[in-house]
Amino acid sequence: MTNLEQFYLTEQHQLFRKTLRDFLDKEVVPFVDQWEIDQQVPKEIFLKFGEMGFFGLTQEEKYGGSNLDFWYDVIFIEEVSKSNSGGFGASISAHPYLSLSHLKHEASEALKEKYLPKAISGEWHGALA
């Protein structure tokens, strides 16, 4: 058991880690090499991540998020990093942690209401320019 697990993570965190790991092993790992060749992550995988709630872990519930603590984000990044693809990890992590985090902290209420629900669901993809 690591210090992180011993001192900070609850049973709910561990259950989330297992759920995410099982999801990645089924929906990502078998296909990630082809995605690297194609230089593209299929839109369907973003929708699946959205359906599982992975894009809204620390987002407010009123936008479709789960309003969970920071440790869920840490677990998400750790597990995605184990998927043997830097391209996939960067692509799937940029959406919630680069684009959506800016909306969460900087956008007006009107912009949050317009963009966050569809972005959290995986229907829309965020980007930085």
Task: Report the location of each language-model feature.
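Glycine-rich flavin
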Residues: 29-129
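A non-catalytic, amphipathic alpha-helix used as a structural packing/dimerization or gating element
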Residues: 12-26
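Intrinsic disorder at enzyme termini
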Residues: 1-12
